[in-house]
Amino acid sequence: MLPFYAQWVLESYDKAISPLLVSLLGLFSIASVLFVPKNRRFGVGFFIGMLWFYWISLGLRYFDMSFLIPLVVIACGIFMGFVFYIGLWCECLIVRFAFLLLLSYLTPFGFDWIVPESVFAYSYIGVDKLSFALSILALWILFKYKTWWKLGGVICLVFALDFGLKDSKIQNLPPLKIKLAQSAVSQDFDYRMREAKSIFSEHISDIQKAINEEYDVIILPESAFYVPLDSQYFPYFDSLLEMSHKIVIIVGALREEIHTDGRASYFNSTYKFDKGKVSFYDKVHLVPFGETLPSFLLPLVNTFFQGIGGFSAGKDFGYFDIAEIKFKNAICYEGSNRGFYADYPQYVIVTSNNAWFVPSIEPILQKNLMKYYARLYGSVIFHATNLSPAAIITPFVSSR
């Protein structure tokens, strides 16, 4: 956890964290799990769970369920406490080694952010499983053995370093001038409905400003236009079509689909406006307990609470073609999902709305996971955000 919190503090002062510092803090974090006494394993897991995932509860603020926040935070702690209690039952190398290597495969209800390797995302240490295994082995040898055996730990650590980290990001970027919008819109529903006209107008102004500054592409955040674009609440559709002759517009919006029986399905979508034509991709990988719910919980939740789990999932991930360059589209949570990167996309567009979870460590965790996957799969990620810093994330160790 230490690299995440250090990065959070430094970035709040617009300071980049040193890869060397991340490397050292990452090794310390892994060591704190590797060598935890078995009689303290539940307590350590409990506090790690709370510090790592307390932010999950913050979205409840917008559904009049703030009273549940402490319970959810404690539940996160208890869950990770039991995981540590079961996984760290023995203080031997083979058990601790296997636990740390396999922890990233733990995905409760599809939630796949339990990735200990991500502590090395901005470090000099490799993020693949082999490098992680060598780091664990190095720590074990350095702390458990004496005299010349420690040399073996140093050798393991040297081989865990990523020597392919030459920072050639300039040559790796597409030949397009891309504007990443960074908005600051509260998630409060009353505010969003009351100020919709001014918020949407500001987004249109941002697009016009990007045109004036001669950008080729502008990417706006997830749900920047949080109503269906063909609804009476959105008078700017024709303006977007007209502006798209001067700039390619990528923007998040709500999409409504009416079925033959009159039922409506709602999708979290990304639209592309280009030369007067419109295309879109729906979000495929929905957020557990936010945009989707396990089927056994639906009757209970629909009885007491409205507005949670109301989105439908899209069918497939897709690529936007911009000036004959392919960009794979991801919406928020998808950009930190391993399955999304399975085809090794060269360029990725990620749009996010982090208003649900700020102020918290969530944007830092998201950024580190995207950096982790960028390094693992060689992708360049263009991340446009609401209420967190926008960024170009490369496969190289740098401030990005």
Curated annotation (Swiss-Prot):
Q: In which pathway does it act?
A: Protein modification; lipoprotein biosynthesis (N-acyl transfer)
**At the top level of its lineage, which domain of life is listed?**
Bacteria
The signal peptide here is none
GO CC list: plasma membrane
Q: Which residues form the active site?
A: 222 (proton acceptor), 283, 332 (nucleophile)
Query: Which molecular-function annotations from GO does this UniProt entry contain?
Result: N-acyltransferase activity
Q: Name one Pfam family in it.
A: CN_hydrolase
Q: Which UniProt keywords apply?
A: Acyltransferase, Cell inner membrane, Cell membrane, Membrane, Transferase, Transmembrane, Transmembrane helix
Q: What is its EC number?
A: 2.3.1.269
| Locations listed in the record | Cell inner membrane
- Biological process, per Gene Ontology: lipoprotein biosynthetic process
State the similarity comment. Answer: Belongs to the CN hydrolase family. Apolipoprotein N-acyltransferase subfamily.
Biological role stated in the UniProt entry: Catalyzes the phospholipid dependent N-acylation of the N-terminal cysteine of apolipoprotein, the last step in lipoprotein maturation.
Entry protein name: Apolipoprotein N-acyltransferase
Source organism of the structure:
Helicobacter hepaticus (strain ATCC 51449 / 3B1)
Source organism phylogeny? Bacteria, Pseudomonadati, Campylobacterota, Epsilonproteobacteria, Campylobacterales
